[in-house]
Amino acid sequence: MTETVWYASYGSNMHLSRLRCYLAGGTPDGGAITLPGCRHRAGPLRSVPLTLPGLQYFATESLTWTGGRAFYDPDASGETAARAHLVTIDQFCDIAAQEMYRTPGTDLDLREAITHGRSTLGPGRYETLVCTGTFEGHPVLTITAPWRYTDLPGNPPSAAYIHHLAAGLTESHAWTVEEIANYIATRPGAELGWTATTIAAVLGQATRIDAETIAPSRTT
């Protein structure tokens, strides 16, 4: 089996600085939980934008961000914007462990997911592995829940979580604030607390603050 796989992130791990907390350990901006990191702490070999068949949605309650978590329903109609990171197999296994608040270090058998497209490690929210195919000779794997997006109530994401989603979509797909706001607002669960207008306002305000922070000081 290949020694590297594409980890297809569709949530906050699209944002590279957020992913680094999973790889090297640390607490993400706006997060409440410190992650231990992977056995192999190097960054991804490559990161590329991808579009997955299926639907992103928000449900349950995140201990890290509060608000809804992002999940992926591969059986629903639609498309999901993602960012694939080329990582080692042990890194992928350790990311999966941390998604379930477990101690990393246990290798997973990925053969069923790679061969048959899906495998279930357990009943937990991030214990279903989905292989959407291959890209440049490496399997594309992602992590999600066993249920359909219609199986449980939606829960809108927090503003902090939206900031990481937006940063990841900007880095990978080069989307504008308007494109990001329209995309997130139309994911099931998000509409319970957000509109495209309110998301754009939050992201626009953050962009202005960032610009002011990095602007060179003027002397008189």
PLM regions: where:
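Glycine-aromatic micro-motifs
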Residues: 2-220
